[in-house]
Amino acid sequence: SIYYKFTYDVPDEMAAKGYVTVEKGSVTVNGVSLTVCNSERRSFRVAIIPYTYEHTNFHAIEPGTEVNIEFDIIGKYLARLAEFSR
């Protein structure tokens, strides 16, 4: 199937506050809830199907475009729990 991949860098101040993504977890980008297909320490990738690409503003996003990102709170809690269990 055809889909689009978007990779986003997590800003340092957000990473420092414990905002993280987990693979198969969710993240909201510009108001669109998406599934994370790849998660790194400071970046994550989402795959967007053609319908979503065409019916949202993703078709207008270019490299370097600022977007609104809302992280899944469960990922933040899991990261915090892992920190305390060390």
Residue ranges of predicted features:
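Conserved loop->alpha-helix
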Residues: 1-86
